[in-house]
């Protein structure tokens, strides 16, 4: 197994940011087995959250 760190963001939610990271990573990394959300943050403009950010660790199997 190998672990890589991935940063991702979304205008919608932390869940969407996580899915975006997995979708993008799976284009070049095969056999992703799990994702661990290490950090969550958000960008705020005025009184609105404008961007959700996640710092993830993706675990994948090396064959």
Please place each PLM-identified region on the residue numbering.
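Soluble periplasmic/extracytoplasmic beta-strand elements of cell-envelope proteins
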Residues: 5, 36, 55-57
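A cross-kingdom feature marking charged/low-complexity
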Residues: 40-63
């Amino acid at each position: 197994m190998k672990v890589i760190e991935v940063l991702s963001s979304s205008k919608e939610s932390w869940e969407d940011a996580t899915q975006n990271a997995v979708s993008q990573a799976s284009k070049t990394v095969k056999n992703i087995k799990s994702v661990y959300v290490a950090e969550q943050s958000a960008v705020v403009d005025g009184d609105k959250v404008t961007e959700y950010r996640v710092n993830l660790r993706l675990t994948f199997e090396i064959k």
